A protein has these predicted regions:
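An N-terminal hydrophobic leader/cap segment in hydrolases
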Residues: 14-65, 75
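The serine-hydrolase catalytic nucleophile loop
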Residues: 93-105
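Catalytic nucleophile-loop/oxyanion-hole region of alpha/beta-hydrolase
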Residues: 95-96, 120-151
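Conserved alpha/beta-hydrolase
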Residues: 104-126
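Hydrolase active-site cap/lid region
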Residues: 173-230
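Short beta-strand/loop motif that positions the catalytic acidic residue
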Residues: 243-244, 249-252, 256
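Short alpha-helix in the alpha/beta-hydrolase fold that links the catalytic acid
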Residues: 260-269
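Catalytic histidine-centered segment of alpha/beta-hydrolase-like enzymes
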Residues: 283-295
Length: 314
């Protein structure tokens, strides 16, 4: 006859199972938090060698430095007016991609000069701290100073996509006087990079949305520990009491799963009366709005620009 286990032995086994489960879950939690942080701060080294010449656009290779002496590589395209656009590319991208070159052509056809440059850690530019658009505002500031000091330009507008859009808007919020730029066009900016990262975890792992959200504290802490970066900074900037004085046109994509339309909608709400929100339905993924809605996209931009010129001339 088998001897029955004593309550003490059973309790010991339960304790061992509990310990194993706890440490296993903790290990998985730490692994996913750290892995997500490292993936978030990993910049793709891919560089496209295309330039505006493929569209028959003449350009000048330029180089300037931000306040940290980081070398920033770019192009200058001369326009017919004294107005200019600064092109701010997306994350893990560079100005040599055809998407941006086609935009340069569109803006140049409107008579604008264009300064397009690679952010730090991207393309041919130098290395620097990556912060999802917080410290990158100094790259934007350097591009504006380059134009003011070297070109005969009166009105400067910013067009940015995703990471570039959020960075451009952050610059306008920092710049409380609103005098450096005449307007910002932000194509699918993100409101909170942590949300974007958590959504990616739920799409790429067996974890559902609820379980992925539990990783938020771990991702925030590991980003601070390993990269000296507070991922809540972007959201805090948008939720600050700073009043935005720069007119902004914000684009969203109804079917965007990378940066869902809830992000640009919240940004529009934050920026208030100085902003306008346009949402495109004919887009299947992040960055499709310009490609599949070209005429409407440029039409909205032209109207926005004309409104700013009319206000200025009153």
């Amino acid at each position: 006859m088998l001897a029955l286990e004593s309550p003490l032995v059973k309790l010991k086994k339960l304790f061992e199972i509990f310990n194993f489960s706890f440490f296993f879950i903790a290990f998985i939690y730490l692994f996913l938090s750290i892995f997500t942080s490292f993936q978030a701060f990993k910049i793709n080294e891919f560089y496209s060698e295309l330039n505006p010449d493929i569209n028959g656009i003449q350009f000048e290779e330029i180089n300037f430095k931000n306040k940290f002496s980081t070398s920033l590589n770019g192009w200058w395209v001369e326009g017919e007016s004294d107005n200019a656009f600064i092109i701010l590319h997306g994350l893990r991208s560079n100005i040599g991609e055809k998407f941006y070159i086609d935009l340069i052509s569109e803006f140049n056809n409107l008579g604008f000069s264009i300064l397009a440059f690679d952010f730090r850690n991207h393309g041919k530019s130098g290395e620097g701290k990556f912060s999802f658009g917080v410290e990158e505002v100094y790259d934007v500031d350097a591009s504006i100073k380059y134009i003011r000091e070297n070109k005969n330009i009166e009105n400067i507008f910013i067009w940015g996509f995703s990471f570039g859009a959020t960075t451009g808007l952050n610059y306008s919020i920092y710049n409380t006087k609103g005098s450096d730029v005449s307007g910002i066009i932000a194509d699918t900016p993100y409101y909170d990079p942590i949300e974007v990262l958590i959504d990616e975890v739920s799409k790429r792992t067996p974890l559902n949305s609820y379980l992925s959200k539990l990783l938020k504290p771990g991702i925030i802490i590991s980003s601070k520990v390993f990269f000296d970066n507070d991922l809540e900074n972007i959201k805090n900037i948008f939720e600050s009491e700073t009043i935005n004085n720069t007119p902004s046109l914000i684009f969203g994509c109804k079917n965007d799963t990378t940066v869902p339309n809830s992000h640009p909608r919240r940004i529009k709400k934050k920026l208030g009366a100085m902003s306008k929100y346009v949402e495109f339905e004919n887009c299947s993924k992040h960055g499709d709005s310009f490609i599949y809605n070209n005429e409407e996209y440029i039409y909205e931009i032209s109207n926005f620009l004309n409104e700013q010129f009319e206000i200025k001339n009153k």
